[in-house]
């Protein structure tokens, strides 16, 4: 699995340990929820501030407010059969607001690392086709997210 992590904000300190955490969570999510995808996939994770994610949220969802994570899947309606042999299949892009990550960690009473892991897992599940439009889907997605995090020592 190829994972590109880009820190495009300067408000929240972002360390190599945080980048490694994102990689471990993304790999674990693929392992537990990516049935049929294999491991030759790629994903990008971009870390932004609230201003940037507000702009993206407005442009793509029509909501002029910050959010914690956005996912842009490459699998939706795409034919990936034309990829050159050996090239990783692009799952898509995850955008995480580190400002939201800090505030939500404080609000929920857990660590920044646990929240960063949660947002990464949540974004990965969306890239792999999971959603939370119904209460049943939301419960299923939350349970899978918690399973991913528990396997990495990030449970509540």
UniProtKB/Swiss-Prot annotation:
Cellular compartments annotated: Cytoplasm
InterPro entries from the UniProt entry: MetalPrtase_cat_dom_sf_prd, YbeY, YbeY_CS
The entry's keywords: Cytoplasm, Endonuclease, Hydrolase, Metal-binding, Nuclease, Ribosome biogenesis, rRNA processing, Zinc
GO MF term (any one): zinc ion binding
Gene Ontology CC terms: cytoplasm
Pfam families assigned to the protein according to its UniProt record, in alphabetical order: YbeY (PF02130)
Domain of life assignment: Bacteria
GO biological process: rRNA processing
Cofactor, how bound (note): Binds 1 zinc ion.
Cofactor(s) annotated in UniProt: Zn(2+)
Positions with a binding annotation for Zn(2+): 122, 126, 132
Entry EC no(s): 3.1.-.-
Broadest EC class assigned to this enzyme: hydrolase
Role: Single strand-specific metallo-endoribonuclease involved in late-stage 70S ribosome quality control and in maturation of the 3' terminus of the 16S rRNA.
Family: Belongs to the endoribonuclease YbeY family.
NCBIfam families to which the protein is assigned, alphabetical: rRNA maturation RNase YbeY
Xref: HAMAP family: Endoribonucl_YbeY
Name used for this protein in its record: Endoribonuclease YbeY
Species the sequence originates in: Symbiobacterium thermophilum (strain DSM 24528 / JCM 14929 / IAM 14863 / T)
Gene that specifies this protein: ybeY
């Amino acid at each position: 699995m190829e994972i590109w992590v880009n820190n495009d904000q300067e408000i929240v300190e972002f360390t190599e340990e945080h980048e490694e955490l994102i990689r471990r969570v993304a790999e674990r999510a693929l392992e537990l929820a990516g049935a049929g995808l294999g491991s030759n996939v790629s994903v990008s994770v971009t870390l932004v501030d609230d201003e940037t994610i507000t702009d993206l949220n407005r442009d793509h969802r029509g909501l002029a407010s910050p959010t914690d994570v956005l996912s842009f899947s490459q699998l939706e309606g795409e034919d990936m059969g034309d990829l050159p042999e050996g090239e990783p299949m692009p799952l898509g892009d995850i955008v995480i607001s580190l400002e939201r990550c800090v505030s939500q960690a404080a609000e929920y009473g857990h660590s920044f690392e646990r929240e960063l892991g949660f947002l990464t897992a949540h974004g990965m599940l969306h890239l792999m086709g999971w959603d939370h439009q119904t209460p049943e889907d939301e419960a299923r997605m939350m349970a899978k997210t918690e399973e991913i995090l528990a396997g990495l020592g990030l449970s509540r």
